[in-house]
Amino acid sequence: MFEAFRVNIPVSTGIIQWMLNSAWPSIYWQLYDYYGVPCAAYYGTKKACEPLQLIYNYKDSHIYLVNEGLYEGDVEVAVKVYDDASALLSEQSKTVKTSYRNNVDAFDMTAYAGKPHFIALEVKCKDGKVIADNFYCIAAERNVYDWDNFDWYITPIKKHSDLRFAFAQPEAEVAMETSYADGVYTVTLKNDSDVVSYMNILKAKDAEGNMIVPAYWSDNFFPLLPGQTKTVTCKADVAGAKIELDK
């Protein structure tokens, strides 16, 4: 919803977030749970709200560069498209000019409509440093809504999009290296396989195997493309933590 709001500025004029936290352990939709642990939604929201970001618009299957920050000038934008078997279908990059709240139509993805695929996006500044990235699993068909039973707080869904292909990839071989200094764990993951490692979840645990709370990850619940290396950090006031990877 954050991305839908941003990609439609200035037609969209506001947004309300429901909900921030989980009052009970069993509730969902929250950004962090009953115990203060961020959920996947937290990291997705964080990425959606990057000041400068590439966003896929589900309405027209185009990718837009949005800017609600102070940076103005040229940036390099790049897109990679993979099919549902992790084969690279397309790779494009270009230089575009960006300015505050001036959305730029960067890429046309309509050629892939009707087929399940992955989309990986990057924004780079002049020195080649990646300043934003984004990732999508696009189903062959969109959700089908039951508009006849629309109410002010909910629109029921007749048929959900089929995203099972994202979890049907062969298990990827992901190598992990960790280091610790001054209260910060640095974790580097490398996907040594030729398939998309869709959901990589990092956890910091104590000697008894309990999750360390709070633990502040720079990113989590993220994909790794074939051959990709990614480094993240975790601030936790516990030395000797065991870093675990679920995928």
What kind of feature is each model-predicted range?
Residues 1-219, 224-234, 242:
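Carbohydrate-binding surfaces of carbohydrate-active enzymes
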Residues 241-247:
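A compact, surface-exposed functional segment
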